[in-house]
């Protein structure tokens, strides 16, 4: 645990030191769980968006984009269930005065049980080697069965209690499991209470006539209320999807773990509209498609797993999370939900407008069912950043910190580095910079030794460092250094554009999906 905490502290400090993420309003002592993306952070964030957008829109003929407003009519949130049901069950520790989500405390307890089960599996793998039959072991080993049955019983009881709003039983479960404050070890808990997560605001010049509004807690509803506009103007038949990237806001009472859980965050969502009765088929398809999208990033298949929901949201008939192994354990990265026709039918009732689709193949009108994929952009940023940040000891005993991001996502694609500013090297380097800047995001740097400049570029994830020296002036070749291997090669200046493009083009990621 201490090692994981050290890794996480390194992630947070590196993100600030190298211009990726700053605490918001820092000169005024900041705001809890709100962050600003710096010069390198915004480039990485935009590249992640571009990868998602291309995979959703560019590679799928039947998915189109949308950018809906943050402010929407307040009745939308009544229809969606957010006014009445968008709550978190919170519990306070009387000794530490810290507040926690009761459901997360219980889920973390179950995650430890799963860790114990995995340790039993790993021990058996080492013992039996290539002859190990994992499926048989998992289905017969008493310890694994005990750990997993206990998890199932606990999560099922919690889901039932939350569905029935039986908060007393949620507290009783915490006490029966002897769950303690993870920071202090105290088991002295208050009662569990529900807190609504929506931010309220006002629309109007005069306070007495102002309309109550909400900052949207999710981007999905903007898609639902526009679905018929998009369908008619795009002339798409079902199944088709609408994708959107946008800000959402939640008054998280318990906001921790850096950018993993924030009050202002960004979502990348796609709502896929399908004929009733086909939703579970498309749900399974999108589960696999979304996992493949993540795996193409090269962060390791062992760092992902599906978590199928025992407790379903009020709108869903099936739901699963793609979880990622963060420094603080496996946590949700993306959700895939079969939302049925809950949202569109609710908006029909509350608006009085028909939202039915006429299906020419079935020769009937119906309210479509919806399959949703929703990934937290900030969480994906954290997954990439924490996994790719490495400290390496080199053959000569020296050390370096490198951010080994997928080249297509790297904030800066190449650094242009004149060995010295004098003797025409600076001017030649500027010429290369000005020639390539139309195709790639570059950085020009001529201060400090070349070794120090290499280290700075390693730390922000730049795939290539291009050094201009005395020989460049006569033979028009440069030294190009590769980030991950640190190998150097001499190449013609005329080849640079193609070399960089071959490495950083989004085609390299998209073709792996």
Task: Locate predicted features.
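NTP/phosphate- and nucleic-acid-binding module
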Residues: 1-513
């Amino acid at each position: 645990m201490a090692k994981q905490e050290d890794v996480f502290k390194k992630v947070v400090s590196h993100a600030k030191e190298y211009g990726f993420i700053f605490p918001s309003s820092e000169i005024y002592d900041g705001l809890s769980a709100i962050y600003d993306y710096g010069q390198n952070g915004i480039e990485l964030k935009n590249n992640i968006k571009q990868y998602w957008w291309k995979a959703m829109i560019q590679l799928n003929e039947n998915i189109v984009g949308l950018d809906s407003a943050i402010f929407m009519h307040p009745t939308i949130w009544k229809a969606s269930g957010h006014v009445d049901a968008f709550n978190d069950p919170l519990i306070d520790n009387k000794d530490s005065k810290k507040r926690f989500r009761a459901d997360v405390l219980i889920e973390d307890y179950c995650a430890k049980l799963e860790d114990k089960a995995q340790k039993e599996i790993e021990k058996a793998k080492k013992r039996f080697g290539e002859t190990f039959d994992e499926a048989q072991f998992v289905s017969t080993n008493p310890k694994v069965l005990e750990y997993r049955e206990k998890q199932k019983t606990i999560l099922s009881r919690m889901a039932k209690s939350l569905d029935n709003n039986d908060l007393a039983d949620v507290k009783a479960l915490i006490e029966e499991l002897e769950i303690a404050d993870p920071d202090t070890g105290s088991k002295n808990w208050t009662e569990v209470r529900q807190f609504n997560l929506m931010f309220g605001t006002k629309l109007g010049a005069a306070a007495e006539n102002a309309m109550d509004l909400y900052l949207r807690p999710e981007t999905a509803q903007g898609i639902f209320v526009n679905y018929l506009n998009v369908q008619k103007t795009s002339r798409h038949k079902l199944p088709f999807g609408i994708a959107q990237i946008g800000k959402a806001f939640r008054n998280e009472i318990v906001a921790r773990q850096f950018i993993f859980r924030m009050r202002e965050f960004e979502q990348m969502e796609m709502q896929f509209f399908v004929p009733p009765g086909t939703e579970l088929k498309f749900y399974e398809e999108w589960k696999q498609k979304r996992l493949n999208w993540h795996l193409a990033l090269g962060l390791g298949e062992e760092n992902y797993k599906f978590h199928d929901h025992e407790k379903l949201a009020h709108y869903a008939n099936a739901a699963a999370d793609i979880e990622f192994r963060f420094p603080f354990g496996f946590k949700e990265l993306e959700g895939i939900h079969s939302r049925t026709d809950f949202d569109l039918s609710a908006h029909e009732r509350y608006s009085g407008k028909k939202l039915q689709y006429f299906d020419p193949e079935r020769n009937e009108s119906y309210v479509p069912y919806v399959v949703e994929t929703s990934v937290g952009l900030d969480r994906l940023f954290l997954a990439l950043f924490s996994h790719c940040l490495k400290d390496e000891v080199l053959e000569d005993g020296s050390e370096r910190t490198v951010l080994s991001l997928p080249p297509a996502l790297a904030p800066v694609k190449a650094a242009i580095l004149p060995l010295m500013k004098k003797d025409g090297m600076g001017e030649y380097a500027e010429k290369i910079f000005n020639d390539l800047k139309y195709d790639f995001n570059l950085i020009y740097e001529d201060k400090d030794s070349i070794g120090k400049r290499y280290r700075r570029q390693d730390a922000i994830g730049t795939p290539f460092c291009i050094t201009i020296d005395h020989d460049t002036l006569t033979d028009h070749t440069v030294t190009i250094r590769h980030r991950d291997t640190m190998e150097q090669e001499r190449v013609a200046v005329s080849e640079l554009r193609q070399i960089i493009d071959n490495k950083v083009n989004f085609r390299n990621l998209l073709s792996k999906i």
